[in-house]
Every structure is written in C-alpha cells, then in structure tokens.
Swiss-Prot record:
Physiological role: Part of pre- and post-splicing multiprotein mRNP complexes. As a component of the minor spliceosome, involved in the splicing of U12-type introns in pre-mRNAs. Involved in numerous pre-mRNA processing events. Promotes constitutive and exonic splicing enhancer (ESE)-dependent splicing activation by bridging together sequence-specific (SR family proteins, SFRS4, SFRS5 and TRA2B/SFRS10) and basal snRNP (SNRP70 and SNRPA1) factors of the spliceosome. Stimulates mRNA 3'-end cleavage independently of the formation of an exon junction complex.
Assembly with partners or alone: Identified in the spliceosome C complex. Found in a pre-mRNA splicing complex with SFRS4, SFRS5, SNRP70, SNRPA1, SRRM1 and SRRM2. Found in a pre-mRNA exonic splicing enhancer (ESE) complex with SNRP70, SNRPA1, SRRM1 and TRA2B/SFRS10. Component of the minor spliceosome, which splices U12-type introns. Found in a mRNA splicing-dependent exon junction complex (EJC) with DEK, PRPF8, NCBP1, RBM8A, RNPS1, SRRM1 and ALYREF/THOC4. Interacts with DDX39B, CPSF1, RBM8A, RNPS1, and ALYREF/THOC4. Seems to be a compound of RNA export complexes that are released from speckles in a ATP-dependent manner.
Locations listed in the record: Nucleus matrix; Nucleus speckle
Residue spans of biased composition, Basic residues class: 171-207, 276-329, 336-351, 533-560, 567-592, 621-636, 649-663, 809-834
Stated name of the protein: Serine/arginine repetitive matrix protein 1
Any single Pfam family the record assigns to this protein: PWI
Linked residues for Glycyl lysine isopeptide (Lys-Gly) (interchain with G-Cter in SUMO2): K127, K231, K249, K447, K459, K472, K869
Location of Phosphothreonine modifications: T220, T241, T406, T416, T555, T572, T574, T581, T614, T718, T778, T793, T872
Protein's organism: Homo sapiens
Listed Low complexity bias regions: 352-368, 478-501, 593-605, 701-719, 736-759, 771-786, 837-866
Keywords for this protein: Acetylation, Citrullination, DNA-binding, Isopeptide bond, mRNA processing, mRNA splicing, Nucleus, Phosphoprotein, RNA-binding, Spliceosome, Ubl conjugation
Claim: RNA-binding is one of the keywords in the record: yes
Region: Necessary for mRNA 3'-end cleavage and cytoplasmic accumulation, residue numbers: 1-156
Family statement: Belongs to the splicing factor SR family.
Length: 904
C-alpha cells in the first residue's frame, strides 16, 4: 500500500512529469507555412545558406556562427520539423524573432523544393534583377568608358588641332618677327647705304637708297621670298661659282631686285615684327650706312656676297667685311625668311620645342632640302647666306648701326642688344668692320640668337628656346624670332652646316652660359669681327688695332656680345667662305657640309678673317686675292679665325670665351675649310673635348702657326658651333635631351669619326690656348668638365644614334667632308704653308676636331672650360684622346675608321 499510489501510473499520467515540448507546441504561435513539410533533398541548401546567414546577422545584429551552424545542421535532415526548429531557435533568437525568421525561411524552402534547380524563385528573381542591374551597370560603365574615351580623343584632337593652329599661327609670327625685321631693315638700309655710300658700281643699293629701302620694306613682303630666292640663287651661285666675276654683275641685277624684294620683305617683316625696332634700327642703320661708306660697300658685298663677295673681299678688307655683312643679310634674310616662314618656325619650334631631336631632324631636312632644291639651296645657301645674311644682316644691321654707333639698330637685336648694340655701335662704330661682323653676324645671327639675347639672355641663354622666349624679352622677341629664324636657318644649314651653325650658336650660347665670358667671347668674336672688319677695311693695321681694340672691346663684346659675335658669324657667314670655296658648292651639294663650311666659315670667317688680317695681314690679302680662288677664301675663313686668334689673344680673356668658342669654332671652320668639316661632324665628342682643347688649340692657332690652326680650328668650330647652335639648344637640351645632340652628333659623330683624331691632334694645340683661355676659362672650366663628361658620354650614344640615324648622312657627310677636307686642307695648307703647312695641317686637322669638340664643350661649358682647358689642355690631349677614343670605340668604331682617315 506504501507504493500502491504509484502503481499503474505512467510518466505521461504523472503530473510531476510533463512534456514541455508539447506544451510549447501548444503555447507557441507558428506561421501557417510551417505546417507543410519540406524535402530538403530537393532544396539547394548552398543557395539558402547565404540568406540564412544574412538574416540571422540582421536579427542578432552580429554574425553568430554557432546559431547559423545550428540552423544549417537542423536543415540537413531530409524532412526537418519546422515547429521544432522554431522552438529550438526561440532560445537564440527569442520567440518573436524566431517566428519571423521561420516564417521567412520556410516559404523559401518550399519554393526551392518546388523549383527544379532547388533554388527559391525569389532568389531567382532577385538574381535576375541583379543580373539585369549588373548588365545595366556594365552597359553604363561601358558607355561611360566609351564616352570618356571619346572625350579623351576629342580633347586630344582638339588639343592637337589647337596646337597645330597655335604652331601655324606662331610659325608665321616667328618667321615674320625673326627674319624680316632685323635682316630686312638692316640689310635694306645698309644696302641703301652701301649703294649710296661706298660702291656706286656695286651700289646695288643705288636703287636701294634709303628711300627705296623703306618703300621696299613696305612693298616686298610678297617679293622678298621669290626675289630673294631668285636673287639668292644667283647670288649664291655667284658666291659659289663666280665668287668674284659674277659678284659684280649679278649684284646690279639682284640688287635692284633684292633691294626691293629683300628690302621689302626684310623691311616689311622687320616692320611687322620690330616696327619700333625697325624704325629706330632703320634710322640708325641708315645713319650707320651713311656714316660708314665701308659699310655700304660691305652691304653690296653682302648682297653680292656670292657675286662680288670675293671681288669685294679682294678690293678691300673693309669692303669685304662690310659687304659680306650687308650683302649676305640682303640675300640671306629673304631665303631664311622662306625657310623661316616655311619651316624655320616649325624647325625652330622643333629646335626650341625639341631642339635636340627636331633640330637634328629639321637640320637634316634642311640639309637635305637645300641640296634637293636649288632654289632652296639658294634659300638654303640663302639660309647660309641668311645665316650669314639674315643672321648676318640683322647682326650686320646691328653691327652696322653699331659701327655707326647707332644703338637703335642694335635695338633690333633686342632692347638689351640695342643697349649693347649702342655700346657696341659706339664701340663697334669701330666695327664698321662688323659689317664683316655681318658675316660674323651670320654667325652673329646665330650668335645674335644667343648673343643679342645672350648679352642679357645669355645668362638666360641656357637654352636657345630660352633665348627665343626670354632672350631679350621685348626686343629680344623679335630678335629672338630672328634668331630663331637664324637658328632654324642655321639649323637648316646646321643639317648641312647646322650643327656647325647650331654649334656656333651654342658656343655663343655657351658664351651666354658663360655669361660675361660668353659675352666676351661673342664680343671678342664681334670684336674680332669688328676689329677684323676694321682690319679688313684697314686690313693689316686695322687688324692689329682691332685685335687690340678687342681687349678694350671685351666690354663691347659683353655689351654687344650678341651684336659683336654676330658680326663674327656674319663675317664667317659672309659668303666669302662659300665663294672662297667653290667647294662651298660641294657644300651645297652636301648642304650640311657646305653649309657647315660656308656658314661656319662665314661666321668664323668674319672674325677669323679679321684674325687672319690681324695675325697675318698678307695672308688675308692673299685670301682676298684668293677670294676668287675659293680655297683661299676658305683659308680666308680659317685665316679670319687666325685673325681672331690674334685678336683672340687680346680678346682672349673676353674673346677667349667667344674666341675659344669662336677660336675653336674658327679652328673648326678652318677644319671644315680644310678637311675638318667632316671632323666637325664626325667629332661631336671631339668637339666637346675640342672645345676645351680648342679653346687652347685655337689660342695656339692664334699664335703664329696656331693662328692658321685657329683659323682652321675656329672656322671648323664655327660650323660645329652652328651645330651647337642647333644643338646648343639641344645641347642645353643635350644635357636634358640628347636627340638633338644626336643630330649634332650625327654631324658630330661624323665629325668625331674624322674629327676626333683631329681633336686628339688638336689637343697639342690646346696648351697654347690655356693662357688665352685662362681668363675665359675661369668661366669655362666648370662647364667644360661637365661637357666633357656629357659630350663624351652623350656623344657615344648620340653618335651611335647618329650613326644609325645619320649613318647614311654621316657617310655622305663624311664623303663631302673628306672632299671638303681635301679642298680645305689644300686651301688652308696653302695659307698655312705660309705659316706652317705641315704643323698647321696636322695640328689644324686635330686642332680642328679639338676645336670642334672644344666648341661643343665651350658652348655649354664655356664657364667650366678655362681651368679644365688649362689643366685639360695637357690632360685634354690625353683625356680628349682617351675620351674620344673611348667614345668613338664605344659609340663610333665605324667613326674610328672615319677618324683614321680624317686624321691621316
């Protein structure tokens, strides 16, 4: 009975034991859908799991892996109990959330088991929507991308078109401002003065009396190019073929034409560009013309540089310098206009924009185009002439006005150049010879580009483009534009002789870099130009005087570095070099060689001829006598370097920079005049080295035998300098960009091939230059080492490129250079034989290459050159030889072969 109470009662019947789940099932509220059973075998659980995870995370506020996995485990059973699941989840989610969760989950499972794929239709719809949205988004993105691309393309196209428009609009402006204003006015005015003043027979300017000049200025914006082309062909032909005989005859015919077209074009363009300048310059130049009859003579010469160039040269050194200066401006400004107007702007843009690469291309195109187009030849020789004449004519104008001591004309160069020109003119009124300075001005034009802006911009002149841009901001703009024209012309001739002309500009710009030393150099060139013009006019005594005056003129050079150096260039540019060298016609054939030699020689010839006259007055007369014999004229160019070298000694400190550049450039010109032209082209690296050595070798040349060498080395260096003018921007760029150096080195790689041996040989001459280069070398020495490193290093790669790019060009140039070398060697040797044929020849070739290298180095490292030149003159010989050998070995083994032939 004790346990009777518990008998027969089961746990279910016992109130103490209840089934709590049953109670919960009775108590809890469940969604209706939970009544249906789900076959999980038909459901794709992997699709449901992401939803469960998401939902549980939403309910709990955080991701609870335990709960999620618990739910998954419950669903893994074939037929899960929905109510029991809800009861089990109530502890985790609480009753309400669990009910809601199960109410959402079960319909998904039901729809999933009904679906063939086991995926809930809601998910399918969601995914479809997502897919559609994705597609829409992708389409939008694609359309956006397309739109962006279209916009980019449009922007690019717009930019390109705007750039093209800007370039187009800029190029005419540059052309107008650059070539016309300085050259037209100065050349027409000077032509008028020439005609009115000194040579009535050669008075091409008879019709070009001051009155016709202004009229022509206005009249011949249209005529200048065609008439210039026509005249220039005749003039250039006269220059090359009939230096003396044709000169007087073509002069009268082209003079009337040229006065009107060239004057008109020059004057009008100048008016357009520098109407303020042109007015003051034309006035001052007219004054200058009236003031200096010798200038009037030179003008005729300038005009008929090719025609009466040699005769004029012969008639009187004074006439020679001034006519060259004036006549080349007449001729050359119009053709440069053409080139400037055509491609000069583009080329200048190229040169300024991509001076390194495009200067080489533009120069190559120019050198190619001049030979291709006889008219262009005339224009390219005109370019030469223009380099001589345009650059010469503006410089000449400047110089002529400056000889008359009319600062306004020099204003053409630039406001600063005007001041320096004024000082120059007052000082250079000494340098009516700077009409020969006009030739120098051709170089001067290049120099002007660097010099006239260089005087002040020379420091700014770190780049020719800088010169162009800020050269001498106000007047420099037109002057710079002119310079750009000249640069382009020079670069065009730089192609042929562009690297030389560019190098001329570069040395001058390196002068600018050298600052005062550069100015001095330019001034010393200008001095040598003006002294040498004087010397030319006065011949021997004036030479001596001008040499002497150069040292005083260093200030002039500094002040009128741009004008004064331009005269040098112009002198050298003075077609006498061309005319001297019937080989200049070969140069025209190999436009680059010819231009190199003629332009460079011209440029340097002006100052070198002064040097020669100074150094050996009789040789200049001989060269004058030999003006008809182009070889002697070439020599005259190289002798002008001699004269320079003699003036260089006095100018050394001031002139050294310019003279080292110019002395070295004259040595290069002479080099080119002899056979160094190839060397110049071949020895870009030699040139850099040579610039150091050349500064010393040119001084050596400036000595008795070194003066002939300098002539050779200076005039070759003039050509290399022209290249530098092309690549000085590049070289300045060269340091930045070696494309143009490549072009230069194409030329200079050719040069280095034949020229590097010469630089090695020239290195011996280097020691003499140390003394001369000491004063400038102080400024130079810093730059020269850099240039050595840069130019040797760049020159291998650029020469390699130039070997590849300019391989064909180099071969042609080498052949042309070899021919020219032979011709120049013969001619220079004739002149040198007087002083030292064997020493001059051997030293001239190697010094010429060294001068070329020195020109390159001096151009950018004029400041650094002097001390290095002193130390490196002895070391430069070894270092330059080693560097040249290494560079040539590395970059130009083929150039070594060429070097062996040039050296031999």
């Amino acid at each position: 009975m004790d346990a009777g109470f518990f008998r027969g009662t089961s746990a279910e019947q016992d109130n103490r034991f209840s089934n709590k789940q049953k109670k919960l099932l009775k108590q809890l509220k469940f969604a209706e859908c939970l009544e249906k059973k789900v076959d999980m075998s038909k459901v794709n659980l992997e699709v449901i799991k992401p939803w469960i995870t998401k939902r549980v995370t939403e309910i709990l506020g955080f991701e609870d892996d335990v709960v999620i996995e618990f739910i998954f485990n419950q669903l893994e059973v074939k037929n899960p109990d929905s109510k029991m699941m809800q009861i089990n989840l109530t502890g985790f989610l609480n009753g309400k959330n669990a009910r809601e969760f199960m109410g959402e989950l079960w319909p998904l499972l039901l729809s999933a088991q009904e679906n063939i794929a086991g995926i809930p239709s809601a998910f399918l719809e969601l995914k479809k929507e997502e897919i559609k949205q994705r597609q829409i988004e992708q389409e939008k993105l694609a359309s956006m991308k397309k739109q962006d691309e279209d916009k980019d393309k449009r922007d690019k196209e717009e930019k390109e078109s705007s750039r093209e428009k800007r370039e187009r609009s800029r190029s005419p402006r540059r052309r107008k401002s650059r070539s016309p204003s300085p050259r037209r006015r100065s050349s027409p005015v000077r032509r008028e003065r020439k005609r009115s003043h000194s040579r009535s027979p050669r008075h091409r300017t008879k019709s070009r009396s001051p009155s016709p000049a202004p009229e022509k200025k206005e009249k011949t914006p249209e005529l200048p190019e065609p008439s210039v082309k026509v005249k220039e062909p005749s003039v250039q032909e006269a220059t090359s073929t009939s230096d003396i005989l044709k000169v007087p005859k073509p002069e009268p015919i082209p003079e009337p034409k040229e006065p009107s077209p060239e004057k008109n074009s020059k004057k009008e363009k100048e008016k357009e560009k520098t109407r303020p300048r042109s007015r003051s310059r034309s006035k001052s130049r007219s004054r200058t013309r009236s003031r200096s009859p010798s200038h009037t003579r030179p003008r005729r010469r300038h005009r008929s540089r090719s025609r009466s160039y040699s005769p004029r040269r012969r008639p009187s050194p004074r006439r020679r310098p001034s006519p060259r200066r004036r006549t080349p401006p007449r001729r050359m400004p119009p053709p440069p206009r053409h080139r400037r107007s055509r491609s000069p702007v583009r080329r200048r843009r190229r040169s300024s924009a991509s001076l390194s690469g495009s200067s080489s291309s533009s120069s190559s195109s120019r050198s190619r185009s001049p030979p291709k187009k006889p008219p262009k030849r005339t224009s390219s020789p005109p370019r030469k002439t223009r380099r001589l004449s345009p650059s010469a004519s503006p410089p000449r104008r400047r110089h002529r006005p400056s000889p008359p001591a009319t600062p306004p004309p020099k204003t053409r160069h630039s406001p600063t150049p005007q001041q320096s020109n004024r000082t120059r003119k007052s000082r250079v009124s000494v340098s009516p010879g700077r009409t020969s300075g006009k030739v120098t001005k051709h170089k001067g034009t290049e120099k002007r580009e660097s010099p006239s802006p260089a005087p002040k911009p020379r420091k700014v002149e770190l780049s020719e483009s800088e010169e162009d841009k800020g050269g001498k901001m106000a007047a420099a703009d037109s002057v710079q534009q002119r310079r750009q024209y000249r640069r382009q012309n020079q670069q065009s001739s730089s192609d042929s002789g562009s690297s030389s002309s560019s190098e001329d500009e570069r040395p001058k710009r390196s002068h600018v870099k050298n600052g005062e030393v550069g100015r001095r150099r330019r001034h010393s060139p200008s001095r040598s130009a003006s002294p040498s013009p004087r010397k030319r006019q006065k011949e021997t005594s004036p030479r001596g005087r001008r040499r002497r005056s150069p040292s005083p003129p260093p200030t002039r050079r500094r002040r009128s570095p741009s004008p004064a150096p331009p005269p040098r260039r112009r002198r050298t540019p003075t077609p006498p070099p061309r005319r001297r060298t019937p080989s200049p016609p070969p140069r025209r054939r190999s436009p680059s060689p010819r231009r190199y030699s003629p332009p460079i020689q011209r440029r340097y010839s002006p100052s070198p001829p002064p040097k020669r006259r100074t150094a050996s007055p009789p040789p200049p007369p001989k060269r004058r006598a030999s003006p008809s014999p182009p070889p002697k004229r070439r020599v005259s160019h190289s002798p002008p370097p001699k004269q320079r070298s003699s003036p260089v000694t006095k100018r050394r400190s001031p002139s050294l920079s310019s003279k080292h550049r110019k002395g070295s450039s004259p040595s290069r010109s002479t080099r080119e005049a002899r056979s160094p032209q190839p060397n110049k082209r071949h020895s870009p690296s030699p040139r850099p080295r040579a610039p150091q050595t050349s500064s010393s070798p040119p001084p050596v040349r400036r000595g008795a035998s070194s003066s002939p060498q300098r002539r050779q080395s200076p005039s070759p260096s003039t050509r290399p300098i022209r290249r530098v003018s092309r690549t000085p921007e590049p070289k300045k760029i060269k340091k930045a960009a070696s494309p143009s150096p490549q072009s230069v080195r194409r030329v200079s790689s050719s040069r280095s091939v034949s020229g590097s041996p010469e630089p090695a040989a020239k290195k011996p001459p280097a020691p003499p230059s140390p003394v001369q280069s000491q004063s400038p070398s102080t400024n130079w020495s810093p730059a020269v080492p850099v240039k050595k490193a840069k130019s040797p290093t760049p020159s291998p790669s650029p020469p390699r490129n130039s070997d590849q790019e300019g391989g064909g060009k180099k071969k042609k140039k080498k052949k042309d250079k070899k021919h020219k070398k032979d011709k120049k060697h013969k001619k220079h040797k004739k002149h040198k034989k007087e002083k030292a044929v064997a020493a001059a020849a051997a030293a001239a070739v190697t010094p010429a290459a060294i001068a070329a290298a020195t020109t390159t180095l001096a151009q950018e490292e004029p400041v650094a050159a002097p001390e290095p030149k002193k130390e490196t003159e002895s070391e430069a010989e070894d270092n330059l030889d080693d560097l040249e050998k290494h560079l040539r070995e590395k970059a130009l083994r083929s150039m070594r072969k060429a070097q062996v032939s040039p050296q031999s």
